[in-house]
Amino acid sequence: MTKTTKKFETEVQQLLDLVIHSLYSNKDIFLRELISNSSDAIDKVLFEAHQNAAVIEGEPEGKIKLIPDKEAGTITIRDNGVGMTMEEVEKNIGTIAHSGTKAFLANLKEQNVSEHPELIGQFGVGFYASFMVADRVTLVTRRAGQDKAAGVRWESTGDGTYTVEEAVKETRGTEITLHLKEEMKEYLDEWKIRSIVRKYSDYVQYPVVMDVTRTEVPKGVNGEEIEGAGTIEKTVEETLNSMKAIWARAKSEVTEEEYEEFYKHVSHDFEKPLKTIHYSAEGVSEFKALLYLPAHKPFDLFMPERKKGVQLYVRRVFITDSCEQLIPDYLRFVKGVVDSSDLPLNVSREILQEDVQIKRIQKSLVSKIISTLSEMREKEADDYLAFYKEFGQVLKEGVHFDYANREKLQDLLLFESTRTEAGKFTSLKEYVERMPAGQEEIYFITGTSRTALEQSPHLEIFRKKEYEVLFLTDPVDEWVVQGVTEYDGKKLKAVDRGDVIPATEEEKKEQEAKREEAFKQYGDLLSFVKEKLDARVKEVRLSSRLTDSACCLVADEHGLNANMERILRAMNQDVPESKRILELNPDHPLMQVMANLFARDKANPRLGDYCDLLYDQALLTEGSPISDPLRFTRLVAELMVADGKAAAGE
């Protein structure tokens, strides 16, 4: 194959421009990223060797070599990892396979990227950081186990194009050569390189080596220096990192900076973690874990194809970088490493799914994460609130799916309410502690936003009674309340479902008597409205929950409310055909107007118009679309004209 020139995908070029021009004030991280990529590549080839020893090619020890060349102005990062085929080079460097790329780039453009480097770190494009310090990058690679002539040479100046061609490569792995910009030649200095490796990559479990030249006095056979022999230069290969697994060290031996740098290594995030969880488990299942709670959610948190799980090692031997079986889906934001002493080294994906030890480890990890979050909730309220704003939606999934930990997870939930200011939250426990005497249930309402819910007519009687109502505004909340039906012996009740009226037994008797009296006055009118709206409503009844509004729509106790219907439609799901209940306020002046008109002339077409307007008004107040906006606006205009004429005495 001859050398071919190709263009980067548009998205790749946009990312490249961001990296080069606006992303990092700290250029040192280019070396961290390349070393991290090399470490990942060695992990993969050693794991493949469990099933296919041929990929080792007689070189069983992983190694990363740094080669600074002051004369050429280059620094090379060479590894004996898994390497890449031509197809993999094109896929991993020339294009971006992630879905959601455009949305991600739009997010980058909207923000000051230099203040939010985690955005690009989440995207896993650390290789492009090379162009911060280099005006030309050359990559030579060969997939482990393939013929020496199956190598690939890739090169680019970051100008929107790259060249790719076949190449001969004697050894497996990848070699990246950075042709440094003139002002970046400091990265050829031995001590600069040492300091970067020590700071960012000391924990990498494979040796990061570099040839160094030292001047020394020759020594005799007895090891003593030879007097008068002058000096000689000697080049030796030195290991720059300690290679001690950070998770295997005692917590007292690990600095905060080391924890942070390891987090950046495993997560490809460029910000500090919000919380570090480092612990050892002993007994039935022995393992060490170093887990992190990120400070920000990744852009692809809700994408089904997103890589999930933590890294799994068995006795410090890498197994997989995304063991989904260790962490349940509702904790998929957790990053880190688990190192087990009990699993076999040749563990397969099938074994991971069925292994009893894996299940025990997962149970322990989940318990530790939940207890850490509970402790944050109690002792570090600001940090927990920051966490919850980022990951609360995901955590709520656990209430629905993790029955064993449901009660513990309930105490981690936070909601806005009619008692909290916008942006402030309350827990279920705090809600119960504030309940006035006589209140026996926990009330909530679901919807798209606090602003919309605050206008809901369903809240009117609760405001009058000074009963607090929780605002549930995340789509997942509809499933949460299916799992959390009660808390501390108090049932959770939706204020827009069923006949939920906050009242004592005595008050309920009074309300029933009042409703019976009103029914004598409006019973025939209610039947008329039901007949007119029969295709759209299940029932028309007098309301005990309305104090100011004329009407509202209510779902059956277990029926679909407006918010659930909206969510199902947004998910392109079939919405079961259902009718809701139209409640009318017997104390509203409109009811008397309609009753008088009905008594005078039951055939008056204006009565039918009023019925349609009432139903549409109820839809609009809950944020639902109306079926015929044109007719609605025409009827409103006609009523305004009639009212205006009456006011003018015409």
From Swiss-Prot:
Chief site of localization: cytoplasm
Pfam hit, one: HATPase_c_3
GO MF annotations, alphabetized: ATP binding; ATP hydrolysis activity; ATP-dependent protein folding chaperone; unfolded protein binding
Keyword tRNA-binding attributed: no
CDD domains assigned: HATPase_Hsp90-like
Stretches the record annotates as C: 567-650
Keyword Transferase: no
UniProt cross-references to InterPro entries, sorted A to Z: HATPase_C_sf, Heat_shock_protein_90_CS, HSP90_C, Hsp90_fam, Hsp90_N, Ribosomal_Su5_D2-typ_SF
Assembly notes: Homodimer.
Function: Molecular chaperone. Has ATPase activity.
Protein name: Chaperone protein HtpG
